[in-house]
From Swiss-Prot:
This is Flap endonuclease 1-B. DNA binds at residues 47, 70, 158, 231, 233. GO terms for biological process: base-excision repair; DNA replication; DNA replication, removal of RNA primer. Its EC number is 3.1.-.-. InterPro entries: 5-3_exonuclease_C_sf, Flap_endonuc, HhH2, PIN-like_dom_sf, XPG-I_dom, XPG/Rad2, XPG_CS, XPG_DNA_repair_N. Its cofactor is Mg(2+). Phosphorylated. Phosphorylation upon DNA damage induces relocalization to the nuclear plasma. Binds 2 magnesium ions per subunit. They probably participate in the reaction catalyzed by the enzyme. May bind an additional third magnesium ion after substrate binding.
Length: 382
């Protein structure tokens, strides 16, 4: 779920904190990708006749197809992804997980009714609501990534928190996820829509946390309290306090405790046994890997291993998998070229007009030297 309404709130009150870019803008960048979010997207989107792709044994393969081709697409644009997998959910998330189970049970009933009535659109809609990322999905994707030569990290707890830790440690440029709570966990840069289907033609949204703080006039601790008021996975919120009211209260009173002391509790009743302090602690000091000592290595793909797994076990087209493996090897050879800003630190600023002129000249030179790389098409397997 992330944080209720946070993206819209930032767009309304701190629009300069959001930039929109094409995928080509991230050439040479290392990015920590929320693996569970990606796999969920693939299970929803990679379908044939409304159903998830399967092999002859009836095993789902949508997640593998999505992971294979979307990862290749990133590599073709010079992006070096590292995937971060969820660990155990925090105890505080048990309430949210219980609600999800209830919604899934309700969707099962609605699906059954839709099937009896022959309502094709509703059948597809409720089928998607039943999608859940399983341990098997995760393990198969880890095996695939290893064969592709792509690093992955097992987070001890929430993947978004470990993504944020990798960004803060300077191991990667940004965290890529649709969950806005990556910002609450403190990632300096968040990318949304990086792994979205090419067909959707969505620009990549880049959020800068320090600019959010600057434009709203709050610090990280106050931002965490704001997110708790908006609504998170970890505790209830105060009913009746919407996004604009929440931001005004945080600006005025700084903390949830001070807000409680200064609002009409009859009009805005506090949830019983409210765990806002525990939620704050979870966001400010999450359980994460030691990012400073974590080494990320991108290696040569194992073409024969990929064929054995994806074709021998999962029955994908051998021609397509071998073609993908060759793209992996080619992009591995070309991945040593980095970005200029990896070697030089910016000590001053230039005007937006001059910056555009510099970028324009740079892109012209790059095109004349290397030629354009065609965007990787998202292909169907099998």
């Amino acid at each position: 779920m992330g944080i209720h309404g946070l993206a819209k709130l930032i767009a309304d009150v701190a629009p300069a904190a959001i930039k929109e870019h094409d995928i080509k803008s991230y050439f040479g960048r290392k990015v920590a990708v929320d693996a569970s979010m990606c796999i969920y997207q693939f299970l929803i989107a990679v379908r044939q006749d409304g159903n998830m792709l399967q092999n002859e044994e009836g095993e789902t393969t949508s997640h593998l197809m999505g992971m294979f081709y979307r990862t290749i697409r990133m590599l073709e644009h010079g992006i070096k992804p590292v995937y971060v997998f969820d660990g155990k959910p925090p105890q505080m998330k048990s309430g949210e997980l219980a609600k999800r189970s209830e919604r899934r049970a309700e969707a099962e009933k609605l699906l059954e009714a839709a099937e009896e009535a022959g309502e094709v659109e509703n059948i597809e809609k409720f089928n998607k609501r039943l999608v859940k990322v399983t341990k098997q999905h995760n393990e198969e994707c880890k095996k695939l990534l290893s064969l592709m030569g792509i690093p992955y990290v097992d987070a001890p707890c929430e993947a978004e928190a470990t993504c944020a830790a990798l960004v803060k440690a300077g191991k990667v440029y940004a965290a890529a996820t649709e969950d806005m709570d990556a910002l609450t966990f403190g990632t300096p840069v968040l990318l949304r829509h990086l792994t979205a289907s090419e067909a959707k033609k969505l620009p990549i949204q880049e959020f800068h946390l320090n600019r959010v703080f600057q434009d709203i006039g709050i610090n990280h601790e106050q931002f965490v309290d704001l997110c708790i008021l908006l609504g998170s996975d970890y505790c209830e919120t105060i009913r009746g306090i919407g996004p604009k009211r929440a931001i005004d209260l945080i600006r005025q009173h700084k903390t949830i405790e001070e807000i409680i002391d200064n609002i009409d509790l009859k009009k805005y009743p506090i949830p019983e046994n409210w765990l806002h302090k525990e939620a704050r602690q979870l966001f400010l000091e999450p359980e994460v890997i030691d990012a400073d000592i974590t080494e990320l290595k991108w290696t040569e793909p194992d073409e024969e291993g990929l064929v054995a797994f994806m074709c021998g076990e999962k029955q994908f087209s051998e021609d397509r998998i071998r073609n993908g493996a060759k793209k992996l090897a080619k992009n591995r050879q070309g991945s040593t070229q980095g970005r200029l800003d990896d070697f030089f630190k910016v000590t001053g600023s230039i005007s937006s007009t001059k910056r555009k002129e510099v970028e324009s000249k740079g892109s012209t030179k790059k095109k004349s030297k290397t030629g354009g790389t065609p965007a990787g098409k998202f292909k169907r397997g099998k």
